[in-house]
Amino acid sequence: MEGVDYKNFDAVVGKLRTFFRDVKGYKEVHTQNKLSILAACEDPQTIATYNYNGEVWPLPQTGQMWLEHYLLEHPDEKGFFCLSTSYRNEPNPVEGRHDKIFPMFEFELKGGIDELRKVEMELLDYLGFNKEGETMTYPQDDYDNVAAKYGVDELDHIHEEYMERDFGKAFFLEHFPLKTSPFWNMRLLDDKIHANKIDVIIHGIETIGSAERSIDKEQMKEMFNTISEGAYANTLFAQFGKERVQKELDAFLKKDFFQRSGGGIGMTRMIRAMKLSNLI
């Protein structure tokens, strides 16, 4: 039935807004009305499009790059957040895990991966996921270590389910290798083959996806053109024209960058997680 879970949606959004606005001091902005190619496309293989004012645009998948724009243009602010709708035309959706259209709560902040991890642990504490009497004590490990534990090269949704069994209800999976195709603006470690990325796995499902952003313009340009063996850039060029895409990329890379991070929270997944933990 339509709207059957509206009370839980209202409760969880209210808690997230209170944490980021009142506890952390971030500002809420609206990103859904922005026209963009790069800021909309996180996974070009799942893009759906619409025609507006004589041009083809992607239905937005994320508002995080727009939050970056806000933070880069207003560096006096502590951070920004938004409530958005993500359109993911998943070719092979997994029942119970993938919605093709779903609400997201997204945020951007000043600081690197350590600050990002701290804020996310504070958020989980605020929502009530911490063990009684404990704070900021969530298990964490690098992607490669966890993949080795399960005897695979790449982790998938089955392994996320194992993580709840092996590490508990909330687990921080960090430092993703380039073979997992992290977004092109993520900061790389010194080894240049891992990204400063954190997925927060709650009750066996990635519920928060986040990363530190790059400040290296040449690295971002190279990553844009080579990620997924060039398939990311070529898919965008084919759908929207190389000139339009390149113009957006060049405009973004002209900005004055500083250390920053951000992430997105899948609302249906967070509601699920809070239900399973009896928090709503």
Task: Locate each region found by the language model.
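Short, hydrophobic/aromatic alpha-helical segments in well-folded domains
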Residues: K15-L16, V119, E248
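Short amphipathic C-terminal alpha-helix that caps PH/PH-like domains
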Residues: R117-G128
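A translation/RNA-centric and nucleic-acid-associated enzymatic feature enriched
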Residues: Q45-K110, D114, Q140-I280
